Amino acid sequence: MNREALELPLVTKRIKKLLIIFGLMMATNAIGSSPTESKINEVNMNNSPLEGVKFSFIETNGIRMRLAEMGSEGPLVLFVHGWPESWYSWRHQLIALSNAGYRVVAPDMRGYGETDAPEEIDQYDIEQLSADMVGILDALGEETATIVGHDWGAPVASHSALLYPDRFTKLVIMSVPYSGRQDQNPLEGLRAVFKDNFFYILYHNEPGGVAEKEYDSDPRLLLSSFYLSPDSPREKPQITDSKRSAGGFLPRIGAAKGLPDWLTQEDLDYVVSQFEKAGFRGGINYYRNIERNWKITEDLEDLSIKVPTLFLAGAQDMVIRGATKEMLQSSMEKSIPDLQEVILLPNIGHWVQQEAPVETNQALLNFLQ
């Protein structure tokens, strides 16, 4: 992602902290969203780009979800993807952990792939998303699981562990730290800093669905422009004016000159096909709940995550904005007293589990054992 497109104007210390601890924007209330009865209603052994993966569909929390699964025995590890991704982001982890004796499951999250995508924006708040995760355990007949989340999956995983520690007994968060609920409405803070300049989170919150209209017009361009390493070469951006009025997001990024070595053409084709089916509105609705999530979390301010936790990110991930291990540890230690380790992988960017699968898998196995 083009750094200038995300950072203009210069980020102040206050807003930098807000962005580093982005996970706290998604805090929520456990009341009012008890998981409904869940069940597996269909199993499909075929139609998977990853050999050995079994697809199944479950009914839970008012929606139909697709699960990708490997390994039928052993402790359950639940992988939660972010934006703009799919279950397929976890392909390397599904193979490695199932080979190590774990039962591993990666859903298409609400609004993605072949999982249902409700129209109502409030159906994507963190309360609903956390209830979806519990519903998966219920459908699989599992009492507990380790939950692993990346990008938007990180706050979902964090809050699932916060609200349901008896079900999610270990937590791994990737790229997006968790530091509890902040004092200021996060969207108000962003608007105060960026004003009439472009910032993608504010763009995703504009009325009228402008963001998904842009992204749906060319899913391949968006995904190929996002799925890159920090040093991947790009074309020059078509828009360099920082003002929102100058245009949308894609012309600001700069198209990729080629795929990174960790992403094959077949990988990209599969993920593109998933967004051609589902569109981008579901994923954008996660951003549209940032303010709602903040408003309904007041009674969670004093809660902390009690389960053992690992944080993992690429050292060049722009979400952490150059934070050191010590800075990240300090920002999370109050909200996660049992934060066992912070791992930053050098020369790795945002797509950590795909860019560095060997190191990611080893970190997961060390933590799980």
Label the model's feature ranges.
Residues 55-57, 104-106, 341-344:
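Conserved beta-strand scaffold positions in the cores of enzyme catalytic domains, especially
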Residues 19-29:
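Bacterial N-terminal signal peptides
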Residues 69-116:
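Conserved HGGG/HGGXW glycine-rich cap/lid loop of the alpha/beta-hydrolase fold
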Residues 30-32, 38:
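Boundary at the C-terminal end of the N-terminal hydrophobic targeting segment
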Residues 4-19:
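Bacterial N-terminal signal peptides that target proteins for export
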Residues 83, 87-90, 152, 158, ...:
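Signature tryptophan residues that serve as conserved aromatic anchors
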Residues 40-44, 48-53, 63-65, 112-148, ...:
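Flexible "cap/lid" subdomain of the alpha/beta-hydrolase fold that forms the substrate-access gate
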Residues 338-369:
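Catalytic active-site module of serine/aspartate enzymes centered on a nucleophile-bearing elbow/loop
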